């Protein structure tokens, strides 16, 4: 008979397995080789923080692509659509392109990722990205360059043992007390 403790896989073993399947830096470096670095675009999940990302992207001179869920797209496709002068200067707005999909998770479709790569999209992972798509899919299947560390996204999850509070604790930095 197998004892329950023996049947359980250690957390360290689970972490090792996860790292073996996670897209590696070399995988993304290979993808970036095909990018036209003069035509980079900023992409993001079109949720509450997307306008902040778009505003920053436009301010830094990057075209923006908001990946929207059908029925929640008008804010990005209509109200904040970028209007540019004939020289390309932004007159108003901050969303150059709104891609409307049935579900936010459709960014995980291979065909959608191919289109993102053709557009030279660098994806900014906001909280909604890892809420609507599983963290495992983001780590293992999202073959689009991300701004930031793919390895650190798991720490944003509130259910992880080693979450952002754990990092703050280890760094001996203060944070609000849980109520």
Predicted regions and their residues:
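Positively charged, low-complexity intrinsically disordered leader regions
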Residues: 4-31
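A composition-driven signal for long, intrinsically disordered, charge-rich low-complexity tracts
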Residues: 5, 61, 148-150
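A generic short-segment signal for beta-strand/edge and adjacent turn/coil regions
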Residues: 9-15, 32-36, 91-93, 117
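N-terminal phosphate-binding or glycine-rich loops at protein starts, especially the Walker A/P-loop
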Residues: 25-60, 67-68
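Generic beta-sheet signal
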Residues: 40, 64, 121-123
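Conserved N-proximal alpha/beta basic substrate-recognition cap immediately N-terminal to
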Residues: 48, 56, 69-179
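A generic structural motif
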Residues: 60-64, 93-94
């Amino acid at each position: 008979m197998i004892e329950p403790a023996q049947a359980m896989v250690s957390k360290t073993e689970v972490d090792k397995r996860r790292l073996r399947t996670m897209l590696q830096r070399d995988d993304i470096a290979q993808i970036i080789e095909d990018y036209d670095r003069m035509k980079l675009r900023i992409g993001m999940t079109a949720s509450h923080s997307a306008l902040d990302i778009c505003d920053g992207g436009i301010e830094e001179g990057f075209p923006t692509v908001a990946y929207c869920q059908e029925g929640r797209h008008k804010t990005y496709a209509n109200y904040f659509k970028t209007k540019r002068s004939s020289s390309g200067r932004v007159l108003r707005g901050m969303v150059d392109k709104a891609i409307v999909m049935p579900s936010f998770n459709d960014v995980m479709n291979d065909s959608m990722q191919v289109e993102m790569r053709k557009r030279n999209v660098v994806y900014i992972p906001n909280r909604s990205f890892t809420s609507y798509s599983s963290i495992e899919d983001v780590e293992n299947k999202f073959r689009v360059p991300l701004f930031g560390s793919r390895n650190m996204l798991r720490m944003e999850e509130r259910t992880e043992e080693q979450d952002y509070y754990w990092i703050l604790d280890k760094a001996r930095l203060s944070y609000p007390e849980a109520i």
